[in-house]
């Protein structure tokens, strides 16, 4: 079509502004709403607080963005494990499985929403993963002055059963001991090897092939997924456009490009997330020294030991949530401190008082401790998902006062389910009894 | 009937026709605008029963704009546009009809490009150029100064000029 000038734009906008619907249509619309309002009594409805929108509003952005990775990995587990049939992509998967190490860049940008409410955020990460040593990632964010600042280095070291997070600016070094189950889970699910995990998930879903093209002088074939349910849940009315470009000669990916948007408030404001994985260096030589976290003078060391993942831990974590919120969190995977920092319960106010006046580093350490029981319950749930124990959690509707309602359940055997009730007592029930209990859940 | 439903009925009496006109202008389909009106008031009802809305008119307006652009995003097939060369030039004295506008590719492209925007920029632009509201009125609705609204509208105009000048460029992937 012809080029559109500013004059064209203005003239057409004026034309559009003069448009009036027919009187009959307006009358129908108004009368229909009037009738609906006269009859309509909707019970109070709360919208899912989505993890990413909470994170983006966080005053403790650095800590929160680091949590994004943890959450994304945890939630990703459910589909990373899947396998399926495919032809071309199956060949790509086979190639990736042969790779011993890979380095790549990951960039993330969020835009949209009300600028008065949401922080605009841009982050980039360099990843290095090795089958032998584990993974290392260096996180940088675009500060308000437009400069890239490094704020986190994260090491996942399965052989040493540790995860280490370093905050260079605050000079903090946090070491978390992992259980055998955690390590096995990491190995099995390749959390640190995102491209492999993602490819496995894509093979399970519906994807389309894109025509060949050239990217940075390399001939590539593309694949595209638009199923909004396939991606991590970002909010209501999610839309996803996920493209992967593969070098046709090596059959290895050269770029992953994700655009995902979702509503983040009741007015329908949307946030758009743009994630790109690029600059892949497959089978890059690695040195064991690269996986030795640097230890420098003047750092504060903090060792965190998560409690074992079991029912008792889960109940302890849920107790902490009740103290902090006077209810259960809507999503059990919510391991960020934001809910507690906004709550007005005595326990939450105590926490808020305790971190008042602390430096950013001191706050990180304080919250790392604080998150232990909450992470315990989230991790227990993820392990249940991982082990296909058919878990479910109903914190969105069940409260501490619902002593006989199912708050959380998981399968123990073919004939038994374990149930944690709203008052946090636990029982083993038959599948039939569970069905009966779940039919009585509050809507 | 609850207080919140009374407030919504008052809003319907006060601004129902205006909101329906807005939805029609943004979707270019009367039937869709009628459906979205219902959806709008269902959303408002859901929200108003759980929290206090300080400026219901502004809230309704923003929600309507978001609903309309969401519909456009997910119903691209209903956005027919004839290339600019083939469409009759709009004449300001003519009274526009839906048939002429829906066939107008420029208007479809403008709406698609505006749909790619988010937040205050989109709201201010739609209020100013599609609803013909004054800068002062928009500033009051969006809790900004008239100067900020002028700047926002100017930036959007520049964006539209640049975006729509790039013939063949794909807009708004998501």
Predicted regions, residues:
Chain B
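A short, charge-rich alpha-helical start-of-domain segment used by transcription regulators
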Residues: 1-21, 31-34
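C-terminal flanking helix
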Residues: 16, 20, 41, 118, ...
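Structural recognition of an alpha-helix C-terminal capping motif at a helix-to-coil junction
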Residues: 35-42, 54-66
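Arg/Lys-rich amphipathic alpha helix in sigma70-family domain 2
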Residues: 62-82, 103
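DNA-recognition helix of helix-turn-helix
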Residues: 65, 136, 140-169
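Internal acidic/polar
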Residues: 78-103
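A short pre-motif secondary-structure segment
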Residues: 124-128
């Amino acid at each position: 079509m012809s080029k559109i000038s500013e004059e064209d734009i203005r003239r057409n906008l004026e034309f559009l502004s003069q448009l009036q619907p027919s009187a009959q249509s307006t009358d129908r619309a108004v009368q229909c709403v009037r009738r609906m309002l006269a009859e309509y009594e909707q019970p109070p409805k709360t919208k899912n607080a989505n993890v990413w929108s909470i994170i983006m509003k966080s005053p403790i952005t650095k800590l929160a963005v680091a949590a994004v990775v943890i959450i994304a990995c945890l939630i990703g587990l459910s589909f990373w494990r899947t396998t399926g049939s495919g032809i071309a992509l199956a060949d790509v998967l086979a190639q990736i499985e042969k790779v011993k190490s890979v380095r790549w860049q990951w960039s993330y940008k969020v835009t949209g929403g009300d600028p008065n409410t949401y922080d605009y955020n841009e982050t980039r990460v360099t990843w290095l993963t090795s089958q032998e040593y584990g993974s290392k990632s260096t996180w940088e964010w675009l500060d308000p002055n437009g400069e890239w600042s490094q704020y986190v280095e994260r090491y996942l070291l399965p052989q040493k059963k540790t995860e280490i997070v370093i905050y260079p600016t605050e000079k903090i070094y946090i070491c978390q001991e992992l259980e055998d189950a955690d390590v096995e889970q990491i190995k099995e699910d390749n959390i640190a090897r995102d491209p492999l995990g993602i490819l496995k998930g894509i093979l399970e879903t519906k994807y389309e092939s894109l025509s060949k093209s050239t990217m940075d002088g390399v001939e590539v074939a593309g694949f595209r997924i638009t199923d909004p349910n396939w991606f991590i849940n970002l909010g209501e009315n999610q839309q996803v456009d996920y493209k992967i470009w593969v070098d046709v000669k090596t059959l290895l990916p050269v770029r992953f490009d994700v655009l995902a948007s979702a509503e983040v408030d009741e007015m329908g404001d949307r946030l758009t997330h743009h994630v790109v994985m690029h600059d892949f260096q497959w089978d890059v030589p690695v040195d064991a020294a690269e996986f030795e976290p640097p230890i420098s003078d003047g750092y504060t060391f903090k060792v965190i030991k998560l409690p074992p993942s079991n029912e008792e831990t889960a109940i302890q974590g849920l107790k902490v949530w009740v103290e902090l919120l006077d209810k259960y969190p809507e999503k059990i995977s919510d391991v960020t401190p934001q809910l507690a920092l906004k709550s007005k319960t005595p326990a939450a106010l105590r926490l808020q008082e305790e971190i008042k006046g602390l430096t950013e580093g001191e706050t990180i350490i304080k919250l790392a401790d604080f998150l232990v029981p909450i992470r315990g319950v989230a991790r227990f749930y993820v392990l249940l998902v991982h082990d296909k124990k058919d878990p479910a959690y109903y914190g969105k509707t069940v409260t501490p006062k619902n002593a006989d309602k199912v708050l959380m359940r998981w399968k123990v055997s073919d004939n038994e389910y374990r149930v944690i009730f709203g008052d946090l007592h636990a029982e083993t029930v038959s599948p039939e009894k569970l069905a009966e209990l779940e039919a009585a859940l509050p809507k | 009937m609850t207080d919140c439903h009374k407030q919504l009925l008052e809003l319907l009496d006060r601004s129902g026709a205006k909101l329906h006109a807005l939805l029609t202008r943004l979707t270019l389909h009367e039937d869709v605008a009628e459906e979205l009106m219902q959806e709008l008031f269902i959303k408002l009802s859901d929200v108003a029963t759980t929290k206090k809305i300080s400026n219901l008119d502004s809230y309704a307006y923003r929600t309507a704009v978001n609903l309309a652009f969401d519909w456009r995003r997910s119903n691209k097939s209903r956005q027919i546009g004839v290339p600019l060369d083939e469409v009759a030039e709009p004449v300001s004295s003519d009274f526009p009809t839906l048939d002429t506008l829906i066939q107008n590719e420029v208007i479809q492209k403008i709406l698609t490009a505006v749909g790619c925007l988010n937040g205050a920029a989109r709201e201010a632009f739609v209020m100013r150029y599609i609803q013909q509201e004054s800068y002062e009125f928009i500033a009051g609705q969006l809790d900004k100064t008239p100067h900020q609204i002028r700047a926002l509208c100017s930036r959007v105009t520049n964006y539209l000029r640049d975006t729509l000048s790039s013939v063949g460029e794909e807009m708004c992937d998501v």
